[in-house]
């Protein structure tokens, strides 16, 4: 790998195949030539193991950048880089802007991860910035993942990137055996529990053998909504068009979009009935169920409510790594790059949670989440087992994840994208127009669409909308969406940037939505 020549490598390696070891070797070569390496990871708190491996290997050569550094800590890091006391920068997405001058290598680990896309304030994708900096500095860029983004893999197949593959785990360890459970069948057989019979058996087997297990449920809170059993009224957030979620801690209802919270009502606000019932299961409720059914199990929970406290999250991961817990239960953050040698089992409670979100990449996100989470099992010297619970057992993303078959998934997904005109075959711009008054909102949105139609030219550009956004109100602002697709949107982007549209108050513009 030539640190003086720009080239993009897509490193496709199955979970546990040794991608980090390759990063270490490439970094060693880079700093031996007195150049700087930038290593991007999705989230520092959740990828502490890769940071530790770099620090253990390179010591003081490493500086870590993340958003929670104090100004003084950040300045100290910059000074170390300026004096060339350190040559390795590790950090989450914002580290891609680190003030390094003589860059010889950029690595984007887990390049598929959606957390590389900043969704608020200045919107950018750290992977795209990394590619731009690599080209500007004339250095290689490595994009690594067990589940590469469909767009990156397509570019590799087209010859734009060089594809490197690690198809086997280190020491030829087998991939975990995956069982798919159809939850409709469980209900037909009288099992209404959150745990299928196969899931319960796997949990008990893991505990009996003194191994560890990771359980994924991509919904935090206790119950996902609260409803009156007499009139059917669902308790909604007064500021957002979403159901309030019951959180056991604090005994309150909470909105996950605006953080509004209120006490649990004793009667229905619509009909005054006292027959208020909690529906659905979040991580807090599943934790309670685990403690009730498996009394000897030592259980830790890792979700957004926990990771607000950085030290607590780090302590949980450290303690799980030293086997102080038997089960780690959490949202999708439990799927992120963890390498625990005693984890022999993984349980995925609701494989459909991501599959049903209204975005073109829902199947890709589902395959990524299932494959990455399954890949946490069997990374030591013991074989791994995985149980995936779903109501859609015939969906191709779920079937291909069972076989750890990325190429098979890609081949089916890329055909669907081509037929429907989605990336990588067309560029996309997603707009959300917001206003407190619905009539004013409709007028603004319609004017934007009319203006875009008038300036798109004689091209294949399609403009859909305005239509109701997936969540029609957030923080007292009504929302309408506009979707633009076309093989080349450069002229329309330039027009938007230089027109009144760009300065329209309340408008969110997302280029290349993930």
What residue ranges belong to the model's regions?
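Pre-Walker A adenine-sensing motif
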Residues: 1-3
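Inter-lobe coupling/hinge segments of SF2-like helicase ATPases
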Residues: 5-442, 454, 481-482, 490, ...
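Short, flexible, solvent-exposed loop/turn segments with mixed acidic/basic and small polar residues
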Residues: 418-423, 469-475
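Short amphipathic alpha-helices in soluble, non-transmembrane regions
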Residues: 444-450, 492-501
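A carboxyl-terminal module marker
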Residues: 450, 454-456, 461-474
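Conserved short beta-strand edge segments in small beta-sheet-based binding/regulatory domains
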Residues: 458-464, 502-514
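Short Gly/Pro-enriched loop/turn and capping motifs at secondary-structure junctions
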Residues: 470, 489-490
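Short, low-order "capping/linker" segments at domain edges
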Residues: 472-485, 514
């Amino acid at each position: 790998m030539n640190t003086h020549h720009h080239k993009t490598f897509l490193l496709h390696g199955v979970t546990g195949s040794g991608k980090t070891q390759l990063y270490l070797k490439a970094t060693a070569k880079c700093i031996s030539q007195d150049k700087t390496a930038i290593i991007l990871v999705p989230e520092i708190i959740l990828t502490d193991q890769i940071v530790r491996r770099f620090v253990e290997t390179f010591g003081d050569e490493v500086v870590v950048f993340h958003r929670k550094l104090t100004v003084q800590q950040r300045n100290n890091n910059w000074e170390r880089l300026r004096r060339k006391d350190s040559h390795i920068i590790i950090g989450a997405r914002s580290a891609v802007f680190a003030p390094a001058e003589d860059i010889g290598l950029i690595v984007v680990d887990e390049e598929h991860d959606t957390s590389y896309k900043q969704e608020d304030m200045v919107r950018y994708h750290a992977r795209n910035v990394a590619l731009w900096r690599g080209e500007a500095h004339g250095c290689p860029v490595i994009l690594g993942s067990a589940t590469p983004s469909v767009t990156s893999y397509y570019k590799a197949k087209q010859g734009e990137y060089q594809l490197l593959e690690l198809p086997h785990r280190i020491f030829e360890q087998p991939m975990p055996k995956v069982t798919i459970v159809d939850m409709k069948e469980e209900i037909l057989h009288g099992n209404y529990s959150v745990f299928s019979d196969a899931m319960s058996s796997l949990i008990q087997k893991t505990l009996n053998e003194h191994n560890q297990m990771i359980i994924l449920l991509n919904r935090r809170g206790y119950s996902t909504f609260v409803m009156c059993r007499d009139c059917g009224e669902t308790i909604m957030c007064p500021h957002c068009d979403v159901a309030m979620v019951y959180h056991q801690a604090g005994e309150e209802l909470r909105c996950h979009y605006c953080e509004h919270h209120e006490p649990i009502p004793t009667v229905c606000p619509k009909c005054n009935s006292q027959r208020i019932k909690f529906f659905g299961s979040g991580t807090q409720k599943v934790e309670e169920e685990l403690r009730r059914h498996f009394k000897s199990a030592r259980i830790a929970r890792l979700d957004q409510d926990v990771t607000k406290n950085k030290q607590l999250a780090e302590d949980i991961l450290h303690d799980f790594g030293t086997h102080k817990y038997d089960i780690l239960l959490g949202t999708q953050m439990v799927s992120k790059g963890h390498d625990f040698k005693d984890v022999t089992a993984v349980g995925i409670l609701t494989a459909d949670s991501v599959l049903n979100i209204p975005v073109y990449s829902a199947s890709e996100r589902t395959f990524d989440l299932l494959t990455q989470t399954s890949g946490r099992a069997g990374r030591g010297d013991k074989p791994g087992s995985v149980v995936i619970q779903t109501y859609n057992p015939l969906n191709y993303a779920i079937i291909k994840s069972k076989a750890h078959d990325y190429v098979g998934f890609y081949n089916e997904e890329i055909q669907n994208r081509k037929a429907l005109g989605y990336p990588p075959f067309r560029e996309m711009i997603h707009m959300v127009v917001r206003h407190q008054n619905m009539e004013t909102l409709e007028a603004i949105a319609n004017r934007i669409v009319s203006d875009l139609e008038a300036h798109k030219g004689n091209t294949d550009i399609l403009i859909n909308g305005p239509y109701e956004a997936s969540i029609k109100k957030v923080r007292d602002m009504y929302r309408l969406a506009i979707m633009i697709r076309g093989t080349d949107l450069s002229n329309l982007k330039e027009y938007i940037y230089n027109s009144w549209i760009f300065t329209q108050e309340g408008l969110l513009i997302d280029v290349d939505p993930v």
